[in-house]
């Protein structure tokens, strides 16, 4: 079976639960640096797939990371989850976060075959809060070949 087919088949299995994650986030928006319930929810979801979630991390109370694979170039997928004041997830972070999680989980079973590592990086305060800058300054992107 090709990598593409294997990836797609696994995402098909995850489809319902990923939609549930997106819906939950949409219904429970939290502002920059206040994403306590959202980060806890996402961490609990990810623990089903790997118990090695680091939370909190990088000097941010609502940041997390989980890495799949042991060797090879590191791909970092940012999971953004803050909302905007008064309009919630009009920016679509519920969808962006879910897509990043889906991509990371889809690659989880392929990391050894592809010779890579994949890190899902919980990225709070993206909407004007400078969360990515804080993550960068605290080493979250060190050794990454690609960060998306």
Identify the residue ranges that each predicted region occupies.
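Acidic/His- and Gly-rich active-site-bordering loop/insert found
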Residues: 3-115
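Acidic, glycine-rich active-site loops and adjacent beta-strand->loop/helix elements
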Residues: 81-85, 121-129, 134, 139-140
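Short helix-loop-beta-strand segments that form the rim/entrance of peptidase-like active sites
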Residues: 108-128
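Glycine-rich phosphate-binding loop signature in dinucleotide/nucleotide-binding domains
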Residues: 142-144
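Conserved small/polar residues in nucleotide/adenosyl-binding loops
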Residues: 146-148
């Amino acid at each position: 079976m090709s990598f593409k087919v294997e990836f797609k088949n696994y995402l098909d299995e995850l489809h319902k639960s990923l939609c549930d994650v997106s819906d939950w986030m949409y219904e429970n928006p939290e502002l920059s640096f206040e994403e306590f319930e959202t980060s806890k929810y996402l961490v609990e979801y990810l623990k089903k797939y790997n118990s090695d979630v680091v939370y909190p991390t990088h000097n941010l109370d609502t940041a997390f990371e989980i890495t799949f694979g042991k060797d090879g170039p590191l791909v970092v997928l940012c999971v953004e989850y803050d909302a905007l004041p008064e309009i919630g997830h009009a920016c679509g972070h519920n969808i962006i976060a879910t897509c990043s999680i889906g991509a990371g989980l889809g690659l989880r079973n392929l990391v050894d075959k592809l010779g890579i590592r994949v890190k899902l990086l919980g990225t709070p305060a993206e909407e004007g809060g400078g969360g990515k800058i804080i993550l960068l300054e605290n080493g979250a992107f060190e050794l990454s070949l690609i960060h998306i």
